[in-house]
Structures are given as structure tokens and as C-alpha cells.
Amino acid sequence: MLTVLAALSLLSLLTSATGRLAPDELCYAEPRRTGSPPNTQPERPPVIFEPPTIAIKAESKGCELILLDPPIDVSYRREDKVNASIAWFFDFGACRMPIAYREYYGCIGNAVPSPETCDAYSFTLIRTEGIVEFTIVNMSLLFQPGIYDSGNFIYSVLLDYHIFTGRVTLEVEKDTNYPCGMIHGLTAYGNINVDETMDNASPHPRAVGCFPEPIDNEAWANVTFTELGIPDPNSFLDDEGDYPNISDCHSWESYTYPNTLRQATGPQTLLVGAVGLRILAQAWKFVGDETYDTIRAEAKNLETHVPSSAAESSLENQSTQEESNSPEVAHLRSVNSDDSTHTGGASNGIQDCDSQLKTVYACLALIGLGTCAMIGLIVYICVLRSKLSSRNFSRAQNVKHRNYQRLEYVA
């Protein structure tokens, strides 16, 4: 049993999976207030309860809008209502910077906590710099990475009384030959040298990622700064000191309330639109005859080249060699699932990552060998004890027999 548990622990530590693109439903820039609104302040500060025990890999390139998912499988749990919280941090090595935090109340026990599966949820604490770059979607972290966002993201989940912590290592492609502004990110404050390339020699599609539909200039006029967690530039109470900075970085044992996080009172759908607004309002880098409309059209055309997960198996045998050599198809990262909710656990991560199959087989072989060794040891101990018992019994009989003869002789 100990061998099996040790092997399963090894499997959980070796689990890795490719990060997923955000579904098209999250790529919008208009203010939406659909769904349940938050109605209370968080009851607890965001903390990392214990060092991460799960390692996950994620990738991003171009203008992709991505979701970092904590791989927590809740399907085995009972439906009894529970409370939950999710905190996201960025790991600078010596300290962790908080990025976003939210609490959920009265959630269905075997469903991923979300505004739809919970009775209520708190205001979202997010890291903002006059714009909304990050937000939480259910339990996942939503943002459009820049080349300076490569690094380790840590999630800290409290589900009822159970703690889940893990590390998501995000690798952002260094190629900046895309129309969006990729020269940004969390590590830019640390003056970390990132090799920026404009490799026009290797052609690839530039319209890769999320390109929200243009909106009217007055669409966000009725949205308050408080709803977005942004300091009011017209208020003397919100000065530059309230903006986040890299100095607000905490050690594992720190339980101080992060100054970098501001309270956003808007619903989840509004904050998702605010992330899309940042994407739409950025300084675009068009080449030649490119316009935003042509880029959006090209992006939609590229999406049609990527088969859906339902039709992927049936289309696999029908794909031609010409299609496989297409630079557009080759450069796109295929998406295995378009669901906005991720409930996969360690086993799902192993199944989705072909590069881990050898490791999985080796670990399963170790489990088998360990089990056989354990059974053999138990059998050996049983046989040894049987022999010892038989020998002791024989000695007792001999002693008894000698004593009997002695008494008979005396008599």
C-alpha cells in the first residue's frame, strides 16, 4: 500500500499539461452585466497556505487570450454546499506577488465554483494599473500575456477545508512579430532582459489570438472606476501610491493584506469585458495594408483551419499532406476543449500530454514491481513465522518427552 501511495504521489508531481486558449465567448470588449453580481467584501486575505505540490506547463504566443486553470477534480465530491476561495500569485523566487483573489459561498460541492454554481461570491480583488489586465473566470486566471509574463504563476485554492496549491509555468513565445503590443508583463519591473525578436524571415500568420469586436466610444461611459477596481484619476484620495508595484511581494509565511490588489465590485462578465477593452485599446502594430478589420477577418479564417475536439478524430484520417504542411495550420496551437470550465485532474493532464506517456508507463511499472515485491515480502514473512512456530513446537515436544521419560525412570 505504501508503495502504491508513493507512486501515485510521484505521478502527481510529474503531471504536466498544455495551457488552453480562452474560448471565443470570453473575447469581447463591451461592458456586460449579465449573471449574478457580487454582493460582499472578501472575508479573508489571499494567502498561500502551503508550498505548491503540482507542476503544470502552459504556453502562449502572439495575441492569444489564455486561461490558467487549477487542475482540481471536484467531480468525486458530494453535492453538499461548501465555501471556496481562489488566489493567484506570481512567483519572483524570493517572494510572491498577488494578482487576483475571489471568494465563493454556498457552492455545489461537486461542481467548479462559479457565479452560476454558488449562492453568492465576493468582490474580486485584482491587480490593476489604471487598466484591467487580469481577472478571475470561475477559478481560472484570464489575461493576454506579454513576453514579460513568462514565469511561474501560483494558485492557492481553499475548497471547504481542503487546500490545493500548484505552480503553472507559463512560457510566452519571444517572437513579437504580431499586431498586438507584446512588450509588457509582470517581470518587466525587474529589468529582466528578454530577447525580443522581429523574425520576418520565418513567415507565420500574424492574426493569432483574441481580437474583440470594435465598440462605440461611449459604451463604457456608465461604468464606474469602483466596478473595475481602478483608482479614480480625478480623486485626490486615489493617488499614484495606490497603484501596484513590485515591492508588494510576500514570503510564504506572510499573511499581510496585499496593497497591490484593489476591490472591483463589478460582476465577472464586466471584468472579462474590461480585459477585452484593454486588448482593443492597445497600440496596434500593423504592417503594410493591415487594418484591425483585416486582422480580425484573418483570425476567424485561421480558426476554421483548426478542427474541433468532437470532429478531430474523424477528420484525422481525412487530412492531406498538403494541409499538414500549411504554415498557418502548423503555427496554430490546437485547442482540445472549448469549455469555459475546467474540471480535469491529474489523470486528465496525463492523458492530454503525449510527452508524459513514457513517464506514466514507467511509474505504472514501478507500481507493479512494488506491489509484487510487497506481496512476496508478506508471503516470505508468513512462511518464516510458520517455520519458527513449527520449530518451537518441536522443541517443546522434545522437552516434554524427556521429562516424561525422567519421571517414568524415577517411578
UniProtKB/Swiss-Prot annotation:
It is a single-pass membrane protein. Residues 1-19 form the signal peptide. Belongs to the alphaherpesvirinae glycoprotein G family. It is found in: Virion membrane. Pfam families: Herpes_glycop_D. Keywords: Glycoprotein, Membrane, Signal, Transmembrane, Transmembrane helix, Viral envelope protein, Virion. The chain crosses the membrane at residues 363-379. The gene is gG. This is Envelope glycoprotein G. Residues 306-345 are annotated as: Disordered. Its main location: virion. GO terms for biological process: regulation of neutrophil chemotaxis. The lineage of its organism: Viruses, Duplodnaviria, Heunggongvirae, Peploviricota, Herviviricetes. The keyword Iron does not apply. Residues 306-327, 334-345 have a biased composition (Polar residues). Chemokine-binding protein that inhibits neutrophils' chemotaxis. Glycans are attached at residues 83, 138, 222, 245, 317, 392. GO terms for cellular component: membrane; viral envelope; virion membrane.
